């Protein structure tokens, strides 16, 4: 049974967030957490927070099942574009430049591995 966590209206451009999302797509949760902890991208903090929320949601939906992070994997992760705030910046000769402050929505779905690898 899968679990989902959504982070809405994150004040980061979707392009920057997709770079971090691509790092953990399809990976086991314990490996994804290690990758995010060692990432230098600012968006990795938001992805880590949402991933922890998805794991907690999985534990909440399956109270009789004890599952470790090694048995869960990131089934799907995607970033959608959120609202864009449009601002103006004064420019030379009486003009104005438009600044687009972008935001995004992050969705993470985790599931249990069908055949866990035993060491």
From Swiss-Prot:
Transmembrane segments: none annotated. GO terms for biological process: translation. The keyword RNA-binding applies. Keywords: Ribonucleoprotein, Ribosomal protein, RNA-binding, rRNA-binding. GO terms for molecular function: rRNA binding; structural constituent of ribosome. It comes from the Bacteria. It holds the Pfam family Ribosomal_L22. One of its GO terms (cellular component) is cytosolic large ribosomal subunit. The keyword Kinase does not apply. Gene3D superfamilies: Ribosomal protein L22/L17. Part of the 50S ribosomal subunit. This protein binds specifically to 23S rRNA; its binding is stimulated by other ribosomal proteins, e.g. L4, L17, and L20. It is important during the early stages of 50S assembly. It makes multiple contacts with different domains of the 23S rRNA in the assembled 50S subunit and ribosome. The globular domain of the protein is located near the polypeptide exit tunnel on the outside of the subunit, while an extended beta-hairpin is found that lines the wall of the exit tunnel in the center of the 70S ribosome. Belongs to the universal ribosomal protein uL22 family. PANTHER family: CHLOROPLAST 50S RIBOSOMAL PROTEIN L22-RELATED, LARGE RIBOSOMAL SUBUNIT PROTEIN UL22M. This is Large ribosomal subunit protein uL22. It comes from Pelodictyon phaeoclathratiforme (strain DSM 5477 / BU-1). The gene is rplV.
